[in-house]
């Protein structure tokens, strides 16, 4: 049976071995039989550069590389791991895709993205996103010593947590008009994304065209997977 898997928002870190162990089981037992695996951002809790090598990141790269020998792996940057560059992608056997990418999913055009660009009501975050995805800011950051980047990342995570406490759930969710604009721009009726940690299937109509938006779940409490095949699409969980 032909299937394609989509995952996002794993937020892998060395202090959450239960998440990485669940991922490794999924790669070894399920993804190995797939046509392809798409990772739609936030694979890691934080990524400050491909030079931040650790036994943990190496174990993740090794597991992905093993899968890539049989199954193509595609990756779209998230807001936590936008600093992943070609060096790590090569080590992990991943192909880096543009921020918004259209694929043929068993005869249906599907738009893939991490999804943070759709949350336009979070104005402060969008300002940061524009800066951090520009050409100069990432280059400047990657020129800093590794320890300096580690301190900046730690402070940034603490600031982000404090800011999120002050934001309403509505602000942190996608803006429907942005969803519709993106889908119309790419001429698709299926959008798959992550970021919001609110797994669901949303159906709506735009100009008499039926649209579907599928939101992938996070991996904090269980693995969250979208399975796509000729028979349809299904969101499923995997226990730790």
Q: Which residues are covered by each model-predicted region?
A:
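Residue-level marker for buried hydrophobic side chains located in beta-strands
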Residues: 4-6, 37-39, 111, 192
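Short, Lys/Arg-enriched, disordered terminal segments
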Residues: 1-2, 240
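Conserved beta-sheet core of the metallophosphoesterase superfamily
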Residues: 93-98, 111, 116, 122-126, ...
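N-terminal short leaders/motifs
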Residues: 43-67, 165-191
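Core catalytic region of metal-dependent phosphoesterases/phosphodiesterases
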Residues: 2-3, 12-105
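Active-site-proximal loop/helix segment associated with metal-binding centers of metalloenzymes
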Residues: 115-174
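Active-site metal-binding loops of divalent metal-dependent hydrolases
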Residues: 8-11, 42-43, 79-81, 115-117, ...
């Amino acid at each position: 049976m032909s299937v394609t898997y989509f995952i996002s928002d794993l937020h892998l870190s060395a202090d959450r071995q239960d998440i990485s162990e669940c991922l490794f089981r999924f790669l070894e037992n399920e993804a190995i039989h797939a046509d392809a695996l798409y990772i739609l951002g936030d694979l890691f809790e934080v990524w400050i550069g491909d030079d931040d090598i650790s036994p943990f990141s190496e174990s993740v790269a090794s597991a992905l590389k093993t899968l890539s020998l049989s199954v193509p792996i595609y990756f779209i940057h998230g807001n936590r791991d936008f600093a992943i560059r070609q060096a790590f992608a090569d080590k992990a056997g991943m192909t880096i895709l543009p921020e918004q990418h259209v694929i043929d999913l068993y005869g249906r055009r599907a738009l893939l993205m991490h999804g943070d660009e759709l949350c336009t009501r979070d104005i402060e975050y969008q300002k940061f996103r524009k800066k951090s995805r520009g050409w100069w800011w990432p280059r400047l950051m990657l020129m800093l010593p590794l320890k300096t980047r580690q301190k900046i990342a730690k402070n940034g995570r603490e600031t982000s947590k404090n800011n999120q406490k002050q934001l309403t759930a509505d602000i942190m969710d996608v803006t429907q008009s942005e969803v519709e604009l993106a889908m119309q721009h790419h001429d698709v009726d299926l959008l798959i994304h992550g970021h919001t940690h609110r797994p669901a299937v949303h159906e709506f109509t735009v100009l008499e065209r039926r649209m579907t938006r599928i939101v992938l779940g996070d991996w904090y409490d269980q693995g969250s997977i979208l399975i796509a095949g000729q028979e349809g699409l299904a969101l499923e969980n995997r226990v730790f």
